From Swiss-Prot:
Keywords: Fatty acid metabolism, Lipid metabolism, Mitochondrion, Transit peptide. May play a role in fatty acid biosynthesis and insulin sensitivity. This is Enoyl-CoA hydratase domain-containing protein 3, mitochondrial. Its main location: mitochondrion. Residues 1-66 form a transit peptide. The keyword Lipid metabolism applies. The lineage of its organism: Eukaryota, Metazoa, Chordata, Craniata, Vertebrata. Pfam families: ECH_1 (PF00378). One of its GO terms (biological process) is positive regulation of cellular response to insulin stimulus.
């Protein structure tokens, strides 16, 4: 719990749902595409596949037949995969990608009919919100690798990630208004990623924007040709994974903590973080390595 303890000492508050023992280990088949969830329930199949190597965890939305819809089962699988050994020093970066031509079509509308009932609907949206908040509060950077269409909650997922790399064939939309369900929860992430008027046009019309438009408005970080997507995403991930985990974790937490503050408060928080950073073993190691003209040897 060292990372969490350190961030708490810095003043980062983890949401209540993250305090409900989210760090419990998953089943032994974590890296198997067909493994069960944390409870091993047959009724909640895992719809994601994962692999981890050299500090980089790849989480793949693996239900292309359903356009990688963020059903409740998919959301629970994604949440488990993100939380799995989140404090392990071996984990440096997470990449979220998808099988098939659609990154994610958003919520499964078949789960949102009257037949499921209000309580079920509330669980779907609460679980989705938990996943998005988890991405924000996770100690390691989380990247989206997008190749295709990302709509509604799928667009929300992209907007929630720390970095997003997309192929030039990708597009993004919040089309819920067209089926009578305004994308209110996707609007939370979208409205914090793009200018207000851009977000509202997307929300009011449901019309898609291209990858280049998404880049121009700040929804994504980079656009590359489809054949270069994986290589470019991995290049970024490998660079991050080569750095100090504790320094990056502190930096990520500080960035999001200061962002909504007024300028004076933001600088106060950031100044505190710089002092805390210098107190880290890796903070001193990096400075000493620079002075001695050698590569730093990070503690993790």
């Amino acid at each position: 719990m060292a990372v969490v303890a350190g961030l708490r000492a810095f003043g980062v508050k983890w949401p209540s749902w993250l305090r409900r023992n989210p760090w419990a280990p998953l089943s032994a088949g974590f890296c198997s595409p067909g493994s069960a969830g944390p409870a091993g329930s047959e009724s909640e199949p895992r719809l994601t596949s994962t692999r981890q190597q050299d500090g980089i965890r790849n989480i793949v939305l693996s239900n292309p037949r359903r356009r990688n819809a963020l059903s409740l089962a998919m959301l629970k699988s994604l949440r488990s995969d993100i939380l799995h050994e989140a404090e392990s020093e071996d984990l440096k970066v997470i990449i979220i990608s998808a099988e098939g031509p659609v990154f994610s079509s958003g919520h499964d509308l078949k789960e949102l009919t009257d037949a499921q009932g209000r309580d079920y609907h509330a669980e779907v949206f609460q679980t989705c919100s938990e996943v998005m908040m988890l991405i924000r509060n996770h100690p390691v950077p989380i990247l989206a690798m997008v190749n295709g269409l990302a709509t509604a909650a799928g667009c929300q997922l992209v907007a929630s990630c720390d970095i997003a790399v997309a192929s030039d064939k990708s597009s993004f939309a919040t089309p819920g208004v067209n089926v009578g369900l305004f994308c209110s929860t996707p609007a939370v992430a979208l409205g914090r990623a793009v200018p207000r008027k851009v977000a509202l046009e997307m929300l009011f019309t449901g019309e898609p924007i291209s990858a280049q438009e998404a880049l121009r408005h700040g929804l994504i970080s980079k656009v590359v040709p489809e054949e270069q997507l994986e290589a470019e995403t991995m290049r970024i991930a490998k660079k991050i994974s080569s750095l100090s985990r504790s320094v990056v974790a502190l930096g990520k937490a500080t960035f999001y903590k200061q962002l909504p503050q007024d300028l004076r408060t933001a600088y106060f928080l950031a100044s505190q973080a710089m002092v805390d950073n210098l107190a880290l073993q890796d903070g001193q190691e990096g400075i000493e390595a620079f002075i001695q003209k050698r590569k730093p040897i990070w503690s993790h």
